From Swiss-Prot:
Example of a GO cellular component annotation carried by this entry: plasma membrane
Protein name: Type IV pilus assembly protein PilC
Protein location: Cell inner membrane
Bilayer topology term: Multi-pass membrane protein
Organism: Myxococcus xanthus (strain DK1622)
Length: 417
């Protein structure tokens, strides 16, 4: 007869919580941070084991979290870039990791980033690795950052890795800034044109129409056309505005769905005018990310995993995942890259040469530098092409309206003479 089952321990494992603490060192210096523990007693015991005298310990509440409005008060790319540069310099100078984090957190102006850095410092003080502490803040430090720091810690070259990361982020921020500025200008001009047209049709035209009605004469064709457009705009304004909002919301919803994002990312990548610029940006980002990771000692399969996640375009991401699968099967990188038909043949050939000569990281970084310049040239060319078109469009809208509105006045003046 089987023995009765032994009853499992009746007391479940107690859940941990986040605690905020303040303490003093033996020299009287004040310290503060955040710690995960079972209770206040556990925090006090841990602080004493670190040579600190606890002053105040309390459980972290929801009110202690960062309350931020999207686009305001968050951690920006330039904040991370400056932190990485300074951190690399301090590590290179031989300062202990915890001291570096303490100094940088204390000097940080951004309150959100300050809290993150103090939390990371607290984790490291508790015995966590720097990379594991970073991993708990994925909205600030992406997987690329974490993986490279992990490689730097294992290899004892964290300062060199941080310098590479800083260089990578600096070039990446410049690339993003260029693309953003290129896209922002035409959008602003188009929005201004729409706003001006709306004001002219909804506010200005009715005033002129009332004045023309007093003349009692028939309106010229162009003027009548503008008046008809004004009537339509007034009658269907809310219908049009509602339709625009519905289209924007539908697109946003569609883009957030996996299939929708896959479709739209492919459309963006191969659409006229902007498509070639976006493809160059994708190549620059892919080669820069992969080159930085390989030169830092990250295995090729892990590097491709991270590169796929940071691609920024689903079509490019799927292509990188396909290439990774083929490499896992034992194939080289150039063949599968060519099969995706996403990357230019010149890029594929150069990567193939780099792989054959054992200098793929160097070749990838050279390709990235080349495509950074290509993006510059493409954006300058695009701006030079779009600028006069938009100016002519805006001038045509305003000029056409002015001519249409003043034609009856000129006709009336001619009749009086």
């Amino acid at each position: 007869m089987a023995a009765p089952a032994v009853k499992s321990a009746s007391t479940p494992k107690k859940a941990t919580a986040q605690f905020l603490w303040e303490a003093k060192t033996k020299s009287g210096e004040s310290k503060k941070g955040e710690m995960e523990a079972m209770d206040v007693e556990a925090v006090n015991a841990r602080l004493k084991s670190l040579g600190l005298n606890p002053v105040k310990v309390r459980k972290k509440s929801m009110l202690d979290g960062d309350i931020t409005i999207p686009g305001f008060g968050g951690v920006e790319g330039k904040d991370i870039l400056v932190f990485t540069r300074q951190f690399a310099t301090m590590i290179d100078a031989g300062l202990p990791l915890v001291q570096c984090l303490d100094i940088l957190a204390s000097q940080m102006d951004n309150p959100s980033f300050k809290k993150v850095l103090f939390a990371i410092k607290s984790k490291v003080e508790q015995g966590s690795t720097f990379a594991d502490a970073l991993k708990e803040h994925p909205k600030v430090f992406d997987e690329l950052y974490v993986q490279l720091c992990a490689a730097g810690e294992v290899g004892g070259i964290l300062d060199a890795i941080l310098n590479r990361l800083a260089a990578y982020r600096e070039k990446n921020e410049k690339l993003k800034s260029k693309v953003k500025s290129a896209m922002t200008y035409p959008i602003i001009v188009i929005l201004v044109a729409i706003g001006v047209t709306a004001v002219l049709l909804l506010k200005v035209t009715p005033v002129f129409e009332k004045m023309f009605a007093d003349f009692g004469s028939e309106l010229p064709g162009p003027t009548q056309m503008i008046v008809n457009f004004s009537h339509m705009a007034q009658e269907y304004f809310f219908h049009v505005a509602g339709s625009i909002v519905a289209v924007v919301m539908s697109f946003t919803w569609s883009y957030r769905q996996p299939r929708g994002r896959k479709f739209w990312d492919k459309v963006f990548l191969f659409m006229p005018v902007f498509g070639p610029v976006l493809r160059k940006v994708a190549v620059a980002r892919f080669t820069r990310t992969l080159g930085t990771m390989i030169s830092s000692g990250v295995p090729i399969l892990d590097a491709l995993d991270v590169t796929a996640k940071t691609a920024g375009n689903r079509t490019v991401e799927d292509a990188i995942i396909y290439v990774r699968g083929k490499i896992a099967e034992g194939k080289n990188i150039a063949g599968p890259l060519a099969e995706t038909k996403v990357f230019p043949s010149m890029v594929v050939q150069m990567i193939g040469v780099g792989e054959a000569t054992g200098a793929m990281d160097t070749m990838l970084n050279k390709i990235a530098d080349f495509y950074d310049d290509e993006v510059d040239a493409a954006i300058n060319s695009l701006t030079a092409m779009i600028e006069p078109v938009l100016m002519v469009f805006l001038g045509g809208v305003v000029g056409g309206f002015l001519i249409g509105m003043y034609l009856p006045i000129f006709s009336l003046a001619g009749a009086i003479q």
